[in-house]
Amino acid sequence: MQAAKDPQIAAIAVTELWHGVERATRTHKPRREAYLQMSVESLPILPYTGTTALEHARVWAALESSGKMIGFYDLIVAATALEHGDLVVTFNQRHFVQVPGLKVIEPK
């Protein structure tokens, strides 16, 4: 059995989370900002690199040629996970299970 890796997060996922904070109402924004800042500080952020870009292009082309497509940001998350040999933990399995070779689990 393979040992579990510590959680990591793709830079694009951090962008999506911060976008949610920026769209929050003035009432909710400070609390959400503090929570996200604390959460992000505890996780290594995986950058979008040249290798990620190549993996991104491969996944994009494979899905496109099979007539399937997922969101642009989801493609980047998938490519980042594949590049690092990681799995994706998401409530949105419907999109990610379409990516060949990507391991996907739903959190409990």
What are the residue ranges of the model-derived segments?
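PIN-domain endoribonuclease scaffold, especially VapC-family toxins
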Residues: M1-E83, Q98, K103, K108
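C-terminal structural segments of small proteins and small subunits
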Residues: E83, L87-H95
